[in-house]
């Protein structure tokens, strides 16, 4: 049995000893059945939140309104959630009310897909009222109950379906795919931040091409930031050589290059990306758009290692030769890698010139930077001083 489950087992045992039901649920059970890496576990119980808090001496009210209490056990924290049913969904995301219950089956019934609606007890026996194991054997993503109802409860589940398709290399069952197509417009009610997280996970899966093809088939791109009308650009984009090691920066640079937006910054901001990511992708965009493979030393210097490495990575994904080693070697031959590496500072210039600070300092440092970079002069303080025409003291 997986060590993650064994370490968390005392939590289940304490709950059952107190007279309650308790199970491992959700993604951890699914991934166990798929022999995938498990990083953490979720625990569901018939104990109500206050009852959970009575059993464990160290708890935190992390989501108590929805029945979740974080329990500290053996120096680890575990989320323990009470079985619950949910009222109507008012915004295609959040239930209007949550009711705590004692029935495992009713709790599993509210979950998104059958493969995620399997529970495992303290004896590691599986409880699978919706045939999630069969779906896993058939490599099938199948909604629990009526697919349209599940998607209308939380529209993000449609994005999750396609993400799971990519991650697990599964396929959608017919009813789930039909419901996806029928309800796809509801995705516009989902926050961009949640969509962005799912997109990145999708792009790191082994079945990216199939996932994006399904996404395009149901016209999901219409409701993704900046991708409406970009079907013809996304078809070849899906065929690039993506893999799970792909970084987020490469994903966003690749998408920007594929759709060729006039304003890259606005496109990336629409996905609510961090400013650092937007800035880096912007710096690399023009190089990547042209598929730049061959660089002069000065180009490597002004682009910087992070940018030229990013451009090379997207080139490789598009089928070009990997030139990272030779680019790194050429970069290492540069006399300096940034202006900070210059042997002089603005303070030196002020001392030598004996005049007030002004724009002339930046202009002079730029001139020195260019001269050192072209190796017209050595990056040596005395040498630079003489070259600038200041006499030695």
Curated annotation (Swiss-Prot):
Mg(2+) binds at residues 40, 42. Its EC number is 2.7.7.72. GO terms for molecular function: ATP binding; CCA tRNA nucleotidyltransferase activity; magnesium ion binding; tRNA binding. One of its GO terms (biological process) is tRNA 3'-terminal CCA addition. Gene3D superfamilies: 1.10.110.30, 1.10.246.80, 1.20.58.560, Beta Polymerase, domain 2. ATP binds at residues 27, 30, 111, 154, 157, 160, 163. It catalyses: a tRNA precursor + 2 CTP + ATP = a tRNA with a 3' CCA end + 3 diphosphate; a tRNA with a 3' CCA end + 2 CTP + ATP = a tRNA with a 3' CCACCA end + 3 diphosphate. Its cofactor is Mg(2+). CTP binds at residues 27, 30, 111, 154, 157, 160, 163. Keywords: ATP-binding, Magnesium, Metal-binding, Nucleotide-binding, Nucleotidyltransferase, RNA repair, RNA-binding, Transferase, tRNA processing. Catalyzes the addition and repair of the essential 3'-terminal CCA sequence in tRNAs without using a nucleic acid template. Adds these three nucleotides in the order of C, C, and A to the tRNA nucleotide-73, using CTP and ATP as substrates and producing inorganic pyrophosphate. tRNA 3'-terminal CCA addition is required both for tRNA processing and repair. Also involved in tRNA surveillance by mediating tandem CCA addition to generate a CCACCA at the 3' terminus of unstable tRNAs. While stable tRNAs receive only 3'-terminal CCA, unstable tRNAs are marked with CCACCA and rapidly degraded. Belongs to the tRNA nucleotidyltransferase/poly(A) polymerase family. Bacterial CCA-adding enzyme type 3 subfamily. A single active site specifically recognizes both ATP and CTP and is responsible for their addition. Homodimer. PANTHER family: CCA TRNA NUCLEOTIDYLTRANSFERASE 1, MITOCHONDRIAL. This is CCA-adding enzyme. It comes from Listeria welshimeri serovar 6b (strain ATCC 35897 / DSM 20650 / CCUG 15529 / CIP 8149 / NCTC 11857 / SLCC 5334 / V8). The gene is cca.
């Amino acid at each position: 049995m997986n060590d993650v489950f064994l370490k968390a087992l005392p939590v289940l045992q304490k709950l059952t000893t107190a007279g309650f039901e308790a199970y491992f649920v959700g993604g951890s059970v699914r991934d166990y059945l798929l022999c995938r890496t498990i990083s953490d576990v979720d625990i569901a119980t018939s104990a109500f939140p206050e009852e959970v808090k009575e059993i464990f001496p160290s708890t935190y009210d992390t989501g108590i309104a929805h029945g979740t209490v974080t329990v500290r056990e053996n120096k680890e924290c575990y989320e323990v959630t009470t079985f619950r049913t949910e009222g109507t969904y008012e915004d295609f995301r959040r239930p209007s009310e949550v009711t705590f219950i004692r029935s495992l089956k009713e709790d599993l019934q509210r979950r998104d897909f059958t493969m995620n609606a399997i529970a495992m007890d303290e004896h590691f026996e599986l409880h699978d009222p919706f045939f999630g194991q069969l779906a896993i054997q058939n490599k099938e993503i199948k909604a629990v109950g009526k697919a349209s109802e599940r998607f209308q409860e939380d529209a993000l589940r449609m994005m999750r379906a396609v993400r799971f398709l990519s991650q697990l290399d599964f396929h959608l069952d017919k009813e789930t795919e039909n419901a996806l197509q029928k309800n796809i417009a509801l995705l516009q009610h989902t926050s961009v931040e949640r969509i962005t997280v799912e997109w990145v996970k999708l792009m790191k899966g082994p079945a990216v091409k199939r996932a994006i093809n399904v996404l395009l088939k149901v016209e999901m791109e219409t409701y993704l930031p900046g991708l409406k009308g970009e079907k013809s650009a996304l078809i070849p984009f899906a065929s690039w050589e993506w893999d799970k090691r792909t970084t987020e920066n490469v994903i966003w640079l690749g998408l920007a290059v594929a759709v060729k937006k006039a304003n890259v910054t606005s496109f990336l901001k629409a996905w609510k990306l961090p400013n650092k990511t937007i800035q880096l992708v912007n710096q690399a965009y023009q190089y990547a758009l042209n598929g730049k493979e061959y660089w002069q030393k000065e180009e490597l210097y002004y682009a910087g290692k992070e940018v030229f490495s990013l451009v090379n990575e997207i080139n490789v994904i598009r089928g070009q030769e990997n030139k990272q080693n030779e680019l790194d070697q050429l970069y290492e031959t540069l006399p300096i890698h940034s202006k900070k590496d210059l042997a002089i500072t603005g303070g030196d210039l002020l001392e030598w010139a004996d005049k007030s600070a002004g724009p002339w300092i930046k202009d002079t440092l730029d001139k020195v930077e260019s001269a050192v970079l072209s190796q017209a002069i050595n990056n040596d303080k005395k040498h630079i001083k003489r070259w600038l025409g200041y006499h030695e003291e």
